[in-house]
C-alpha cells in the first residue's frame, strides 16, 4: 500500500476516474445554492441531486469530485471518537444513467488494489452487501475477493423518502489485531457495529429503484436510468494510508494540533486525554471553510451551528490553558494544509480571521455573563438550603452561555454542590428532539420524470429579439407526449424561442403564441428549463396546436424591459456593495421581477444608512454615466482573466456569457440585459433587512417605480411639514426635533411630578406594617397609572427600613399588576409571587429581591392581600 499525503490521495482519486472518462466536478460551496432542503452541503452527491432526479441532464454522465462537506447532527461526539468530524471531504464517482454495478465494483477494486494506484493489499479488504443483491456478491467474487471477506448486512439498502434508491455495498479495511485484542471485530462488522479494526473507507450505492413510501420495497419500480453514487471519506483514507491511529494523526489535522501545542504549552498525546486538541482542530477547519463560503456566526440556522462550534472550541482552549483569543491564529494553518485544492481559505484569510476573532471576543464577554449566572444560581441554592444544581439550569448554562457540563460540574463541586446529570440529559434530549423535528430532510431527490427527461429535440433561445416564427417540436399534456392539443394547459418546446426561461434570478418571460392568421392560440404563463436544457413553455391553450406547425412567438416586451432594468441594476448594485462594504459581500440569492429587484448578500451586520446612501448614489452615478453594456461568449478561464465575477457555488458550462457594464461591472450571467445603463433611468433602495445569520437583503426599484418611491417619500414629507407647521420642507426636520425636545422635557417634568406624588402617597401606604412568622410586611392596594409607578413605590420603600417585605397590587384598566419586593434572604420575591399571582388569575416571576406579575381578576385583589401573611 502506498503511503500518500492527503493531497496526493485526492489527486490520485480524481486522476483515476478521469482515466475512466469522468469529468471533474469542482467542489461546491458549503452553503447550498437553490436547495432549501439542506442546511449544509453534507455529501458528495448533495450538489448533484438535479442530475439524479432527472431535472437536469449532465453534459457528461460520468462525474467525479472531491466535495467539502459539513455534518453537525452529533457535535458532542467530535473529539471523543477517532473518526467523527464536522467538516470533512467526500471523494466520489457518479454515473448518471451510464455504467452500473459491474463497472462500479471492478473499477473501484482496481483503484484500491492496482500497483499503479493505491495498491491496497487485497487480503486487507472486506465488503458488505445487501443479502438480496446477489449480483454485487458475484461481481466481487469475479474480482478475486474471497467469499469469507464478503459480509451480508440487511441494512445495506439506501433510501431517504421518495426518489432514487437501491442496495449499497461498502468496502472496509482491516487494520489488524492490534486494533482488535478481543478478536471480535469481524462479528461486530457482521452486526453492522462500528469498530476500530474494520474501518469503512468507501460506500457504493447502486441506485436502481424509484422508492415510493406507499408501497413495500419489493414493489419499487426500476428507474428509467440507473445511477451510481459513491462516497469515500478522504480523512479515513488518509488515516489508513498514512498508518495513523486516528484521523487526527494525519497530515490533515496534525499541523493544526502542533500550532495548538505552541499556543497552549501542552503536548498532544495520541494515547492520552487529547479531546480538546481534536475538538479545536476539527472545529477551526469547519469554521474556516464555512465562513469563507459566506456563512457567518449567528443565533439561528447555520449561523447558530458556527457559533456553537466556535464556543465549544474556545472552551476546550480554556481547558488547555489558552485564555486569550486564539482560534483566529489557526486559520492560516488550515489554509496552508488545504491550499492545493481549496485556495479560497487563504484568499479570504483576512476576512475569516476578522470574523473568528470578533466572535471570540464576544464570547469572552458571554463567558463572564455565564459565570455571573452560575454564581447567582449557587447563591440561590445556598439561600434555599439545597445541595444540587438542577439539570434545567445546567442545560441553560450549556445552551445559552456555551458552558460545557464539565466546567459547570467543576465549579459547582468546588462550591460544595452536586450535579443533576439526569435532569441535564432530559433537557438535552428535549432540545435534540426539537431540533430533529425542525430539520428538513435533505436526502430525497424526488421522482425522475421520464417524459421530460426524454425530450432530446434541440431548442435555441434567441437573446436579441422579442418576436420570431418557429416550428413547434414537442407538446406534453397530462405528462404525456402528444401530437396535438386544443384546450387546457400544456408544455411546449419550439425549435427556437424569444422566451427567456427562468434562471439566475431572472423571472421567465410571458407572452403569446399566434398562428399564421395572427390569432392568439396560447398564452405563455411560465418558461422553465427542461432536464436537457430546452426552454419549456407552460401555456394556457386557447385553440388547436400541433407538432410540426410554425407559430409566431411574441414576448411581453414592456415586461421584459422592466425586468432587464432590474437585472442590469442588480449587477451595478453588486459592484457597489463590493466598493462600499467590502468584497465579502457576495451574492447569496437574487430575484429580478417586473416591479422590483431583490438582492441577498453575505454581510455580518446591518448596512448603515450612510452606507446605503453611498451605495444608492454610486449605482445612480453609473446610470447617469450612460455605460455601454456588452456581452461576450467565452470559456470560464478567459472570463476570469477579464475580471468576471463568478457566483461561488454556481456551476458553469464550457462556454459562459460575460456581461460587462462599462469598466464598472463584469459578471458571468446568462440573463438578458439593457444596451446602456442609462435605460435604467433611476435606482432607489426601499428596504434593507437581515434574512438569516450573516445574510442581508436589499430590495430596490428602478425607472418608473423608483420615481414613484421618491414621490411617495416627498408626499409624506409634505404631510409632516404641514402637520408641524414648517414653512418649507427643509425646515421640517428641525421642527420635528424641536417638538421632540419639548415633549421630552414635558415627559421628564411629568415623571418628576409622578415621583413626588408617589413619594407623598408612599407615606400613607408604608404606615400599615404587619408581621407574620417574624417577618414584617406591607400589603396594600394602590391607585397608579402604570406598572412603572409600582416600581417607583418599591424604590422609595428600599430607601428606608419600613418593612422586610412589600406587596403592592394595582388594578390598571382591565389588568391586575402585582409587585413583591424583599429585603430578607428568608423571603424569595420570585417564589412568593408565583404563589400569589394565581389568586388574581395571573402568573409571573422574578429575582429574590424583586418580582412582578400580571393578572386579570380584579375581584380577587382583597383575597390576594389577605393571603400575604400565609405566604410570607
Curated annotation (Swiss-Prot):
Asked if the record carries the keyword Acetylation, the reply is: no
Q: Which Pfam families match?
A: DHHA1, tRNA-synt_2c, tRNA_SAD
| InterPro entries in the cross-refs | aa-tRNA-synth_II/BPL/LPL (IPR045864), Ala-tRNA-lgiase_IIc (IPR002318), Ala-tRNA-ligase_IIc_anticod-bd (IPR018162), Ala-tRNA-synth_IIc_core (IPR018165), Ala-tRNA-synth_IIc_N (IPR018164), Ala-tRNA_ligase (IPR050058), Ala_tRNA_ligase_euk/bac (IPR023033), DHHA1_dom (IPR003156)
Which chemical reaction does it catalyze?
Answer: tRNA(Ala) + L-alanine + ATP = L-alanyl-tRNA(Ala) + AMP + diphosphate
Keyword annotations of the record: Aminoacyl-tRNA synthetase, ATP-binding, Cytoplasm, Ligase, Metal-binding, Nucleotide-binding, Protein biosynthesis, RNA-binding, tRNA-binding, Zinc
Where does the signal sequence lie?
A: none
GO BP, sorted A to Z: alanyl-tRNA aminoacylation
Family matches, as PROSITE patterns = AA_TRNA_LIGASE_II_ALA (PS50860)
**Cofactor binding: number and manner:** Binds 1 zinc ion per subunit.
Q: Which SUPFAM superfamilies match?
A: Class II aaRS and biotin synthetases, Putative anticodon-binding domain of alanyl-tRNA synthetase (AlaRS), ThrRS/AlaRS common domain, Translation proteins
Q: Give the protein's cofactors.
A: Zn(2+)
- Similarity comment text for this entry: Belongs to the class-II aminoacyl-tRNA synthetase family.
Role, per record: Catalyzes the attachment of alanine to tRNA(Ala) in a two-step reaction: alanine is first activated by ATP to form Ala-AMP and then transferred to the acceptor end of tRNA(Ala). Also edits incorrectly charged Ser-tRNA(Ala) and Gly-tRNA(Ala) via its editing domain.
Entry text on domains: Consists of three domains; the N-terminal catalytic domain, the editing domain and the C-terminal C-Ala domain. The editing domain removes incorrectly charged amino acids, while the C-Ala domain, along with tRNA(Ala), serves as a bridge to cooperatively bring together the editing and aminoacylation centers thus stimulating deacylation of misacylated tRNAs.
Q: What is this protein called?
A: Alanine--tRNA ligase
This chain's source organism reads: Streptococcus pyogenes serotype M4 (strain MGAS10750)
Amino acid at each position: 500500500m502506498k503511503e500518500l499525503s492527503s493531497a496526493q490521495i485526492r489527486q490520485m482519486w480524481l486522476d483515476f476516474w478521469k482515466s475512466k472518462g469522468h469529468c471533474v466536478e469542482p467542489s461546491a460551496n458549503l452553503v447550498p445554492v437553490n436547495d432549501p432542503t439542506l442546511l449544509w452541503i453534507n455529501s458528495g452527491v448533495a450538489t448533484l441531486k438535479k442530475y439524479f432526479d432527472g431535472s437536469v441532464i449532465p453534459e457528461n454522465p460520468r462525474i467525479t469530485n472531491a466535495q467539502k462537506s459539513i455534518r453537525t447532527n452529533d457535535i458532542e461526539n467530535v473529539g471523543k471518537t477517532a473518526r467523527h468530524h464536522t467538516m470533512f471531504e467526500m471523494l466520489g464517482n457518479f454515473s448518471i444513467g451510464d455504467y452500473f454495478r459491474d463497472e462500479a465494483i471492478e473499477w473501484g477494486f482496481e483503484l484500491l488494489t492496482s500497483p499503479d494506484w493505491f495498491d491496497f493489499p487485497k487480503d486487507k479488504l472486506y465488503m458488505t452487501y445487501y443479502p438480496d443483491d446477489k449480483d454485487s456478491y458475484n461481481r466481487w467474487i469475479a474480482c478475486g475477493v474471497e467469499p469469507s471477506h464478503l459480509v451480508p448486512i440487511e441494512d445495506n439498502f439506501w433510501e431517504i423518502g421518495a426518489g432514487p434508491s437501491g442496495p449499497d455495498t461498502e468496502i472496509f479495511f482491516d487494520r489488524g489485531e492490534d486494533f482488535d485484542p478481543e478478536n471480535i471485530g469481524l462479528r461486530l462488522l457482521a452486526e453492522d457495529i462500528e469498530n476500530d479494526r474494520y474501518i469503512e473507507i468507501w460506500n457504493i450505492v447502486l441506485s436502481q429503484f424509484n422508492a415510493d413510501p406507499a408501497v413495500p420495497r419489493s414493489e419499487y419500480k426500476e428507474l428509467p436510468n440507473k445511477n451510481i453514487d459513491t462516497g469515500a471519506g478522504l480523512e479515513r483514507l488518509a488515516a489508513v494510508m498514512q498508518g495513523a491511529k486516528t484521523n487526527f494523526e494525519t497530515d490533515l489535522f496534525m499541523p493544526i494540533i502542533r500550532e495548538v501545542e505552541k499556543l497552549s504549552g501542552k503536548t498532544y498525546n495520541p494515547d492520552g486525554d487529547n479531546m480538546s486538541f481534536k475538538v479545536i482542530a476539527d472545529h477551526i477547519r469547519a469554521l474556516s471553510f464555512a465562513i469563507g463560503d459566506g456563512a457567518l456566526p449567528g443565533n439561528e440556522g447555520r449561523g447558530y451551528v458556527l457559533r456553537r462550534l466556535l464556543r465549544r472550541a474556545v472552551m476546550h482552549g480554556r481547558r488547555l490553558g489558552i485564555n486569550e483569543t486564539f482560534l483566529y491564529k489557526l486559520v492560516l494553518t488550515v489554509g496552508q494544509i488545504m491550499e492545493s485544492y481549496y485556495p479560497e481559505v487563504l484568499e479570504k484569510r483576512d476576512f475569516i480571521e476578522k470574523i473568528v476573532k470578533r466572535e471570540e471576543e464576544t464570547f469572552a464577554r458571554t463567558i463572564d455573563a455565564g459565570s455571573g449566572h452560575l454564581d447567582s444560581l449557587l447563591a440561590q441554592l445556598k439561600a434555599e438550603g439545597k445541595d444540587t444544581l438542577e439539570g434545567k439550569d445546567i442545560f441553560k448554562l450549556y445552551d445559552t452561555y456555551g458552558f460545557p457540563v464539565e466546567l459547570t460540574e467543576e465549579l459547582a463541586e468546588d462550591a460544595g454542590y452536586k450535579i443533576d446529570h439526569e435532569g441535564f440529559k432530559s433537557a438535552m434530549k428535549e432540545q435534540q428532539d426539537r431540533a430533529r423535528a425542525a430539520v428538513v430532510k435533505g436526502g430525497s431527490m424526488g421522482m425522475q420524470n421520464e417524459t421530460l427527461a426524454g425530450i432530446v429535440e434541440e431548442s435555441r433561445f434567441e437573446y436579441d429579439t422579442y418576436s420570431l416564427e418557429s416550428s413547434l417540436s414537442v407538446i406534453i399534456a397530462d405528462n404525456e407526449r402528444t401530437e396535438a392539443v386544443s384546450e387546457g394547459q400544456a408544455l411546449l418546446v419550439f425549435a427556437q424561442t424569444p422566451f427567456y426561461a427562468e434562471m439566475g434570478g431572472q423571472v421567465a418571460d410571458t407572452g403569446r403564441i399566434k398562428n399564421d392568421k395572427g390569432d392568439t392560440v396560447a398564452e405563455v404563463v411560465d418558461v422553465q428549463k427542461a432536464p436537457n436544457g430546452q426552454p419549456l413553455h407552460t401555456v394556457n391553450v386557447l385553440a388547436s396546436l400541433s407538432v410540426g406547425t410554425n407559430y409566431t412567438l411574441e414576448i411581453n416586451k414592456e415586461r421584459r424591459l422592466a425586468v432587464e432594468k432590474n437585472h442590469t441594476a442588480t449587477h451595478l448594485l453588486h459592484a457597489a456593495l463590493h466598493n462600499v462594504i467590502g468584497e465579502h459581500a457576495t451574492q447569496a440569492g437574487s430575484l429580478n421581477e417586473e416591479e422590483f429587484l431583490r438582492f441577498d448578500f453575505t454581510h455580518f451586520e446591518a448596512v448603515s444608512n450612510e452606507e446605503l446612501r453611498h451605495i444608492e448614489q454610486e449605482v445612480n452615478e453609473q446610470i447617469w454615466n450612460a455605460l455601454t453594456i456588452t456581452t461576450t461568449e467565452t470559456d470560464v478561464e478567459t472570463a476570469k482573466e477579464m475580471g468576471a465575477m463568478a457566483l461561488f457555488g454556481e456551476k458553469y458550462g464550457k462556454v459562459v456569457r460575460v456581461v460587462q457594464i462599462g469598466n464598472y461591472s463584469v459578471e458571468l450571467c446568462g440573463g438578458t440585459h439593457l444596451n446602456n445603463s442609462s435605460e435604467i433611468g433611476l435606482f432607489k433602495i426601499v428596504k434593507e433587512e437581515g434574512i438569516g445569520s450573516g445574510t442581508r437583503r436589499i430590495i430596490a426599484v428602478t425607472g418608473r417605480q423608483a420615481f414613484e418611491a421618491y414621490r411617495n417619500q416627498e408626499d409624506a414629507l409634505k404631510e409632516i411639514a404641514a402637520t408641524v407647521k414648517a414653512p418649507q420642507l427643509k425646515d421640517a426636520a428641525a421642527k420635528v426635533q424641536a417638538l421632540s425636545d419639548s415633549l421630552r422635557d414635558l415627559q421628564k417634568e411629568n415623571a418628576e411630578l409622578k415621583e413626588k406624588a408617589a413619594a407623598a402617597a408612599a407615606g400613607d401606604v408604608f404606615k400599615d406594617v404587619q408581621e407574620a412568622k417574624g417577618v414584617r410586611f406591607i400589603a396594600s392596594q394602590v391607585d397608579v397609572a402604570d406598572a412603572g409607578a409600582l416600581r417607583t413605590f418599591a424604590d422609595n420603600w428600599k430607601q428606608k427600613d419600613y418593612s422586610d417585605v412589600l406587596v403592592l397590587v394595582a388594578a390598571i384598566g382591565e389588568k391586575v399588576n402585582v409587585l413583591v419586593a424583599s429585603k430578607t434572604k428568608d423571603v424569595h420575591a420570585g417564589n412568593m409571587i408565583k404563589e400569589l399571582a394565581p389568586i388574581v388569575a395571573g402568573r409571573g416571576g422574578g429575582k429574590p429581591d424583586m418580582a412582578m406579575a400580571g393578572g386579570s381578576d380584579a375581584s380577587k385583589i382583597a383575597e390576594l392581600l389577605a393571603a400575604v401573611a400565609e405566604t410570607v
